[in-house]
Amino acid sequence: MPLRNQNRAPLPSPNVKKEALSSIPFDKRRKETQGTGRRQVLSTVNRQDANSDVGSTEECGKVEFTKDEVLALLNERAKAGKFDTKGKIEQMTDIIKKLKVCVRWYQQVDETHVQDKENLSSSLQSAEKRYSDKELDAKTKEEELRATITEMKENIESLQEKLSKEKLSKLDAIENHRREKDCRVVAEKLQVSLREELDKVKEEKMAAKQKVTSLEDMYKRLQEYNTSLQQYNTKLQTDLEVAREAHTRAEKEKSSILENLTTLRGHSKSLQDQLASSRVSQDEAVKQKDSLLMEVNNLQSELQQVRDDRDRHVVQSQKLAGEILMYKESVGKSSHELDILIAKSGSLEETCSLQKERIKMLEQELAFAKEKLKMVDLSMSHTMTEFEEQKQCMHELQDRLADTERQLFEGELLRKKLHNTILELKGNIRVFCRVRPLLPDDGGRQEASVIAYPTSTESLGRGIDVVQSGNKHPFTFDKVFDHGASQEEVFFEISQLVQSALDGYKVCIFAYGQTGSGKTYTMMGRPETPEQKGLIPRSLEQIFKTSQSLSTQGWKYKMQVSMLEIYNESIRDLLSTSRTIAIESVRADSSTSGRQYTITHDVNGNTHVSDLTIVDVCSIGQISSLLQQAAQSRSVGKTHMNEQSSRSHFVFTLRISGVNESTEQQVQGVLNLIDLAGSERLSRSGATGDRLKETQAINKSLSALSDVIFALAKKEDHVPFRNSKLTYLLQPCLGGDSKTLMFVNISPDPSSTGESLCSLRFAARVNACEIGIPRRQTSAKLLDSRLSYG
């Protein structure tokens, strides 16, 4: 019995049976079992065994095994009789040979797989190295661009500070100039009156004595000499100005912008010093003139008194001389009286000589006063010359300031151009953030405690901080507008993007945010007030104005307009003539109107809406009336958060087809302007009934939009565009080759901080999405004239 057990063929292990059965599907196990009894197992190996007992390694490499053959080989058993030990041994030997061949084949296959794995690993390493090198180069270029932008912003800030300082100094200089001008006018008037009085004195002196005439002649000669000196001084000043201008030009050619700013500071300081000194000298000159005027008046009064005394003495002398003659002729006069008269006559003559000396002294004092007056005139001339120099210096500073402002403007344009180029190369969705002002119904003036704007160079005009529960949440976008930004400032930033539609690009601009955050005001504004027009009317005005200017270059444009709204996941035509304006019918389900609108996308990426009203437009007035019609038909309602809350998504589309007759070139652009309905919480809006249904539909579509953005950000293979009508309509804008910009509107109300944070986080994800590089639609043939949203 033991010998019988030893000669018996070994039974297969139960584990081997389980593994073999587990690798075969349950429904095919019976078929596999039946098939093994009707076919020759491992026919390839059997044919090889018939030719030779042991195959070489090279021959084994040519043999291939299938999975079924390997399983059959593992399940093969000896078929000899129960006591035929030799037959069993031969059969087991054959099975072992077959297994060796199979094992060798598996070894070769495994070696091949290892070699392929090594090759793939080396290829992967080289690809990763190339990718890391490219990524390093891209980061280096990005850092260089950021450094350039940072440097430009620093220069802009410093130049703006210098500009404000120069403006203040300019205003001070203008005020000082006005005061000096008034003082100069008063001084000139006093000088004219003084000269008139002096002329009168000269005339009286000419009548009184020839010596005064000679003094006046000498004074005239001195005046002529003074005039020649002034002319020579003016010539010297002109030469000095020419030399200074040449020196200034040389400095401008050699110095950089920083040196120019330093020079501006020095000139400003010296100008202030010169103005102060000129002001002091002007005051001294005025005081000297006043003192001289008083001295001249005193001299004139004394001179008049001396003249009166002299005339009186002359009259007395003549009278005495007549009396002497009369006394000489008179016989009854005594010689004693004659001596007395002679003595009186001598005393009168002595008094007259004293009066002459007094007149001479007064004349000398008058000449001294005239000399002082000439010195004052020279001082005034010198002051005027210095004032002209300072005025010239002010003009030079103004020219430099204008040149600096021009350089700042050119630098800002270059920065914007580089920024737009980077965004287009990246293919990202641009995001602008706008904060609306506080309203009387908001929770007090607490914006400063909720919203903050960073002042650093990198984040200036692009960053915004939201504070919630003491935690600051920073965000950075392509542009941030504070509550004081006007509609014109906002449109200026997107004007070039709107212009791209005329150049043949697809452009999409949409506003996102919670209800009551200012989306409709941003997009539509108040068209009846020019300063408060929104992006839609301003964009249309620019497009029509630019198209008219391009007509001189041979361009002719055809424009088509359509407007629709997505209300409760249904499309409504806002320009349909059969549409009822009544609010109740507007709120009715679109299924009851008998018209269904479907969205389709063609192979060119264009989106079409069936049965949608398309209107050809040729003027801004025509579009304004269409906008008014659409505004009356749009679904709006009152909630606790907003008096006129938009209850639907509004889509305005302008299709532009342009043809150049001279070059036969055609461009086709599309401008989509979208006002999304705002997200809202039921606890705050208090929506019930129809309002509740509207709120649920709005939140559902915005949630679908969020899912699409998340899928794009993660670069998933499947993007759920079909989950809502809104995302399916925006598919070419979010996943195509269009230029797309999103406005995220937030409220500064402290009670809306949570919603504002959600909106900003969503906007940050949108800004990180890559949708592809924009592609211009241009051709030499006329394209299909159907309206496209894409």
Swiss-Prot record:
GO molecular function: ATP binding; microtubule binding; microtubule motor activity
Localization, UniProt: Cytoplasm, Cytoskeleton; Cytoplasm, Cytoskeleton, Phragmoplast
Disruption phenotype: No visible phenotype under normal growth conditions, but dividing cells of mutant plants exhibit abnormally broadened mitotic spindles in metaphase and anaphase. However, this does not affect chromosome alignment and segregation. Kin14c and kin14d double mutant is gametophytically lethal.
Ranges in a coiled coil: 117-316, 347-426
Tissue-level expression: Slightly expressed in anther lobes with pollen mother cells at anther stage 5. Strongly expressed at anther stage 6 in the tapetum and meiotic cells. Also detected in the gynoecium and the ovule.
Ranges where the Kinesin motor domain occurs: 428-769
Pfam families, per database record: Kinesin
Superkingdom of the organism of origin: Eukaryota
GO biological process entries: cell division; microtubule cytoskeleton organization; microtubule-based movement; spindle assembly
Residues annotated for ATP binding in this entry: 513-520
Disulfide bonds: none
Compositional bias of kind Polar residues: 34-55
Swiss-Prot/TrEMBL domain comment: Composed of three structural domains; a small globular N-terminal, a central alpha-helical coiled coil and a large globular C-terminal which is responsible for the motor activity (it hydrolyzes ATP and binds microtubules).
Function: Kinesin that supports microtubule movement in an ATP-dependent manner and that functions as a minus-end directed motor as well as a plus-end tracking protein. During mitosis, is involved in early spindle assembly. Participates in the capture of antiparallel interpolar microtubules and helps in generating force to coalign microtubules.
Protein name as annotated: Kinesin-like protein KIN-14D
Lineage start: Eukaryota, Viridiplantae, Streptophyta, Embryophyta, Tracheophyta
